[in-house]
Amino acid sequence: MTVIQRWTSEHRALLLLLGVSALMLLLGLGSRELWGPETRWANIALQMLQSGDYLDPYLKGSAYYDKPLPSYWLITATAGVLGDLNHWSLRLPSVIAAWLSVWLVYLIGKQLFSQTTGLIAGWMLISTFYFVFWGRVATADILTVCGLLAAVWWYWRGPDDTRFSRYCVFFLLLAVSSLLKGLIGFVLPGLILLPHVLSEQRWKRHVNVRLCAALAIALAVYLIPFALSHLYGAASYGQSGLGLVLRENVVRFFQPFDNLGPIYTYLLYLPAYTLPWAPVWIIALWVALRNWRHIEPNARWLVWGLALLFVFFTASGSRRSYYVLPLVPFAQLLGAWWVALRLQQRKKVVGRGWKVAFGLSCGLLLLVLGVFYPWSNGGGGVMQFGQDVKARASAQAPWDDWRMVMIEVDNKLPLYVQNDNQPFYFVSEDQDYPRQGDSAALMAWLDKTSGHHFDPKRTLIFAQHRSGDPLPLG
């Protein structure tokens, strides 16, 4: 095979992987109703777009600086490009991050071992149920995975390179990753790369002024959104972004206040989150440990790095199933190393059996996540309710003429009844609003508490009503 033929074959294989990955992440993406944590990102992004305040995140009208701002900014920016905040603009940042993660796993596998290893790792990752599932969900979790992989890939491009530019890019990747979910964007790359940095006293080469200068620049970049919130945000906001960073990352680690999973949580969920390929990486781990002195150094680093990440997450007092997501690509990479090693020992290319297995797994996931799941969650419910409200209200006046009042509503609702009028007015359940009497008393209360006039003929009031309860203002 000539160099040109080999280059063409390699790139054709990569394009197939990336093309299938895009299909699996995009098919049916806009059909499924909001789910679970997506509602928080949808509500906060919607209120930013409605109010024009991108420095003070609010959830249903209340201050909610639970995550750094850039994860919301990605959604609002996508909404600006697509022209609307909807399922597509909400989930597209996660989809792009998941797609890039597949590419990055391929690149890391190719750098560490071989192109065959990279391709197998990529196919394993994109045919992993929970990776694809979370890649189609609007949260910051897959964004963090992508940031971790980007930092690891950049490091392995030149682990002994001490140029200032190399340090700058590396630490900026860490800063940006930390701005998407939290300080684990700094911690996880440092942990997984630590064994390699310590080996052969490599760390001595990297203790220099250039590294310190690059780290200072990255820290300055990291602080920019918090500084903007402090300097230009609403004076009455009442929450500190940096204070909540410490609470959500440091306090939660040592003194957890929720998500109190048992210490064996990740012994259960790491295999579950790597299905259907969990047996492969478990066998690979066993093979690596049995032949520790004889396997290549990069394989030993991978085992050490995976172990450190596992210990870190287990040591945290706050544990949830999906916290294990950053380990998934590296577990699959370990499995791919073993498969490629077996193929090399037998002097075979990726056989028909593996291709069929990847194809069946991808096809099944495509049917479940791209067709069945969106279909089963795409009709009725809050989505249909929003369409019905729009139809009935638009029969009386243009939809954009209506103002919305939300009284302790379902988190899903605001996205489905948005318009181009003034921002929604949220009323919490503990506020002393009129619950009995007529609507005139409620309208007067709204005018008084909001400082704005609500036209009764152009105001829609949403409140949760449970079956059997008396009707509000009945």
Model-derived features: positions:
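Transmembrane-lumen/periplasm boundary regions of multi-pass, lipid-linked membrane glycan transferases
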Residues: N43-L46, G158, L173, L180, ...
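Transmembrane-helix motifs of polytopic, lipid-linked glycan transferases
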Residues: L92-L112
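Specific aromatic-rich, kink-prone transmembrane helix
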Residues: L104, L143-D160, A331-L334
